[in-house]
From Swiss-Prot:
This is Interleukin-5 receptor subunit alpha. Interacts with IL5. Interacts with CSF2RB. Interacts with JAK2. Interacts with SDCBP. Expressed on eosinophils and basophils. The WSXWS motif appears to be necessary for proper protein folding and thereby efficient intracellular transport and cell-surface receptor binding. It comes from Homo sapiens.
Length: 420
């Protein structure tokens, strides 16, 4: 046990000595890097380089560097190497700083800053272009065996408010290590370039690098300040509409199918929106899907137009633009009744309405009884008159007595006697 205790004490002592050697001396003095430079290596791209201070005291420690971007947009990060690439706009100038740091779990030691700067290019800010917008679009490449798809680039801008009339602008783009100048421009009424078209580029439709665009200019009267801008491809990529959209109606079921757009992305990388418009009542239905088929229950007595659009799903890249709607497809029956049939229906309805009004008037004013009085029923009592006339002449011709006799059956009205 005594031997074991001695061994443990020896190991513990060795561990403490080793930790003491590894811990940085808080009294160590850190010196800033030297020869800090900023070099433009491409459109909207700079290389920061520096060297360790040769007077820095060497210890068994790992020194790091903290880089701070001051302009045009603040940022900071740490690195262990002595150079750093930075993609940023440069028309406003660029400045950065770097310092030596040494950190552990308890504290951070840092040197003073070493700084460098790129000044803004010459020219009045009002001479540079404004409202630069760019879009990309993917098409099938039938001319290259290396790439199945080709990306085009289209950019537009407005002339600077203080730019002289003889100003001419020129556009360049950089993607990765490729830089290209525009050859196809559109011009305004003064002949100044205001748009550019690249039918074929080195841009990768599935790429994630920044697209850098620079527009500079020239004039005989003043210096034109250049303008550069960075674009994320997912934010400017104009997706093509879906292909081969079909729609069929079976009873009250509307079945819609389509194919994925022309794109380097596979079929599972798309979201879709289906728009179904009832042309009779104006009802609009929009459904979002992840498949290339949709079934809807509809009114089979109406006519519909169907359209579909697409967007790259967030599963494959950051959310971007929706495509344009596909060309409308019309399905269904929207035949109207013939004019003659409608005319007959209207006439019959009018006649029924008039008769109803007349009937109400007659009922209210008792005209019906006055116009068409009821016919009395024939009586059931029949009078049988039996008349017997007896002439009796009593001797004398001067006096004549006429007697009329009758027999009345039960229920027969009594007639008055007439004596002549």
């Amino acid at each position: 046990m005594i031997i074991v205790a001695h061994v443990l004490l020896i190991l513990l002592g060795a561990t403490e000595i080793l930790q003491a050697d590894l811990l940085p001396d808080e009294k160590i003095s850190l010196l800033p890097p030297v020869n800090f430079t900023i070099k433009v290596t491409g459109l909207a791209q700079v290389l920061l380089q520096w060297k360790p201070n040769p007077d820095q005291e060497q210890r068994n420690v790992n020194l790091e560097y903290q880089v701070k971007i001051n302009a045009p947009k603040e940022d900071d990060y740490e690195t262990r190497i002595t150079e750093s690439k930075c993609v940023t706009i440069l028309h406003k100038g660029f400045s950065a700083s770097v310092r030596t740091i040494l950190q552990n779990d308890h504290s951070l030691l840092a040197s003073s800053w070493a700084s460098a700067e790129l000044h803004a290019p010459p020219g009045s800010p009002g001479t540079s272009i404004v409202n630069l917008t760019c879009t990309t679009n993917t098409t099938e490449d039938n001319y290259s065996r290396l790439r199945s798809y080709q990306v085009s680039l289209h950019c537009t801008w407005l002339v600077g408010t203080d730019a002289p009339e003889d100003t001419q602008y020129f556009l360049y783009y950089r993607y990765g290590s490729w830089t290209e100048e525009c050859q196809e421009y559109s011009k305004d009424t003064l002949g100044r370039n205001i748009a550019c078209w690249f039918p074929r580029t080195f841009i990768l439709s599935k790429g994630r690098d920044w697209l850098a665009v620079l527009v500079n200019g020239s004039s005989k009267h003043s210096a034109i300040r250049p303008f550069d801008q960075l674009f994320a491809l997912h934010a400017i990529d104009q997706i093509n509409p879906p292909l081969n959209v079909t729609a069929e109606i079976e009873g009250t079921r509307l079945s819609i199918q389509w194919e994925k757009p022309v794109s380097a992305f596979p079929i599972h990388c798309f979201d879709y929106e289906v728009k179904i418009h009832n042309t009779r009542n104006g009802y609009l239905q929009i459904e979002k899907l992840m498949t290339n088929a949709f079934i809807s229950i509809i009114d089979d007595l109406s006519k519909y137009d169907v359209q579909v659009r697409a967007a790259v799903s967030s599963m494959c890249r950051e959310a971007g633009l929706w495509s344009e709607w596909s060309q409308p497809i019309y399905v269904g029956n929207d035949e109207h009744k013939p004019l003659r049939e409608w005319f007959v229906i209207v006439i019959m309805a009018t006649i029924c309405f008039i008769l109803l009004i007349l009937s109400l008037i007659c009922k209210i004013c008792h005209l019906w009884i006055k116009l068409f009085p009821p016919i009395p029923a024939p009586k059931s009592n029949i009078k049988d008159l039996f008349v017997t006339t007896n002439y009796e002449k009593a001797g004398s011709s001067e006096t004549e007595i006429e007697v009329i006799c009758y027999i009345e059956k039960p229920g027969v009205e009594t007639l008055e006697d007439s004596v002549f």
